Amino acid sequence: FNLLKETLPRYGITTSFVDVANFAEIEAAITDKTKFIIAETLGNPLGNIADLEKLAEIAHQHAIPLVIDNTFGTPYLLNVFSYGVDIAVHSATKFIGGHGTSIGGVIVDSGNFDWEKSGKFPQFVEPDPSYHDISYTRDIGKAAFVTAVRTQLLRDTGACLSPFNAFLLLQGLETLSLRVERHVENAKKIAYYLENHPKVTKVNYASLPSSPYYDLAQKYLPKGASSIFTFNVAGSAKAAREVIDSLEIFSDLANVADAKSLVVHPATTTHGQMTEEDLRACGIEPEQIRVSIGLENADDLIEDLRLALEKI
């Protein structure tokens, strides 16, 4: 959020923030300077789900690509390219690595977007004088975008993993499906438990039938809406903090999608740099708690939450 709102504008790159579910608002925000639409499969921390097919339709009508952050969706739960997405990005630190040991990212190009026909991306069409006058669309074809990322951006920005971090992420990838299956199984059990707890006023988890995103979850994420979600406790920020401090198995850490279960207070940690207005716009409330459900025994995690909720 801060990258798009604060940092990139210093370099002349601006972003129009819109409601991902308001298609008229998205259409109205697109200008002749718009280069792409970007959204998350699952928003953080509310777990709202983007309608990928509709977003792809809008993007392609305007000859721009749809870029989706599928970090929470994971390649196991959702193949975004099946729904018209052009480029997928992931924080590999999360489910792909799986153990919170490395910082890294992934860009995956579907190869389906026609950069030349779009007319908005001369850097991929015209000869690149820094690389033997190669034309990425002419000489590379479907892999034009990802090749340009590797030969230009990787070379010029130095955003390269060390061999050891690459090894850790590749090792994590080997067990991705097995781990995510357990993550989701645990998350569903815990979300159902919390939804029926008298001291919990709200659970934001799209796999719950009560969620406004349930239908989209059934369409795009039938295996489960990941394992990161938020819930609100009865009371104030003080009550939320007391619950967090009383947990024994959950670690009070700001990362997510780790093998171990994690918990944070979003309003004062992950989103603590945001203004009150921005927090409200994102649906982040003082009494809200975010959990990232790990691979432990689900009954142990439920018991940990039960005891912590008794403290308020």
Stretches found by the model and what they are:
Residues 1-196, 204:
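Conserved PLP-enzyme active-site core in the AAT-like
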Residues 5, 32, 179, 245-246, ...:
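PLP-dependent enzyme catalytic core of the Aspartate aminotransferase-like
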Residues 26-28, 212-217, 262-267:
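Short, solvent-exposed polar/charged micro-motifs at secondary-structure junctions
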Residues 76, 97, 211-213, 238, ...:
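Flexible loop/turn segments at secondary-structure boundaries
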Residues 100, 223-225, 284-287:
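Short glycine-enriched loop/turn motifs at secondary-structure junctions
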Residues 108, 230-232, 292-294:
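Short hydrophobic/aromatic beta-strand micro-patches
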Residues 112-113, 174, 210, 234-236, ...:
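Short, glycine-/Ser/Thr-/acidic-enriched flexible segments
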Residues 157-160, 165-166, 171, 175, ...:
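Conserved small-domain helix->loop->beta segment predominantly found in fold-type I
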